[in-house]
């Protein structure tokens, strides 16, 4: 199998880019039997930061505006980026709306890689509101694009059960099948669905900086 893992296409959602390095290290260094078997039977493509300019802009903001002693208050300047923020690329365009149009160099390179490898699964790692939990697809079924096959959605649900089981075993809050959708094919989690692959969106509650208080702690 070929698995394409894409991280932080929105630059101010940095947990994906940060975790991608840990993922690469874990895959390279682990002697775990499961990981060795996985690597023997899979090709894993890691796109550690799909929006490097946005991530750099975000990092510059939070590192310049953080307190010497970390302050988790949401009103702190660190968590309130000035426009244009780190979500967009160098040209201030949302790259997660450019998968179909492919007008930007990051998108063109990414789609070229996608077409070269034709991955079975593409993961798209994002962040959402600080007071949320964790989301993984499938999304709202009534907002799935009509050209997306039933087989695609059935496999997405099957993969979701695997995630749910592991979240339950670790007492981690999550939700699935609501709020987010699979309609517009210009996004990283849906572009694969019309191109013979399975796109999976992951959304993690964001700190939007170094540390931020939330209703969950």
Question: Residue locations for each model-derived region?
Answer:
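Structured catalytic-domain cores with a bias toward divalent-metal coordination
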Residues: 1-217
